[in-house]
């Protein structure tokens, strides 16, 4: 786990444009992944518990004002920035999706959890039930 403080390329604790000039980032993980494909520990996760009444993540389109807020009971969120979109997918109104034309926010446990006993367990034993929820709330900012 790498702290985001003093690491502006991955610090989204305040509103920040995602991926501006991502090809020029110096972060080795961003270079290796060809963009964002990381898991962030959510601020809603404290002392082994998640406060799912608080916004875990949010994004806003500066062009349309469309806002997405994510609420989850998971401790982490995987952020993927469409690193391998290549212009071969066409969307609404003929919009062609080029590299980094999209962002995914996936609530989940942390990768490598089985090998990190101090992290929240993702182990599911016979007879147990796993319950996870993720709410995507859309609105428009004016």
Each PLM stretch: what is its role?
Residues 2-4:
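Carbohydrate-associated surface elements
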Residues 9-142:
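Active-site pocket scaffolds in enzymes
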């Amino acid at each position: 786990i790498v702290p985001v403080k003093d690491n502006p390329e991955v610090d989204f604790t305040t509103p920040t444009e995602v991926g501006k000039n991502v090809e020029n980032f110096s972060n080795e993980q961003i270079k290796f992944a060809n963009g964002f494909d990381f898991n962030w520990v959510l601020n809603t996760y404290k002392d082994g518990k998640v406060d799912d009444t608080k916004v875990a993540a949010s994004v806003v389109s500066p062009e349309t004002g469309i806002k997405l807020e994510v609420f989850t009971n998971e401790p982490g969120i995987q952020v993927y920035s469409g690193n391998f979109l290549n212009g071969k997918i066409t969307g609404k109104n003929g919009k062609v999706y080029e590299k980094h034309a999209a962002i995914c926010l996936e609530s989940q446990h942390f990768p490598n959890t089985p090998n990190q006993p101090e992290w929240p367990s993702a182990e599911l034993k016979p007879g147990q039930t796993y319950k996870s929820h993720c709410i995507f709330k859309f609105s428009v900012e004016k």
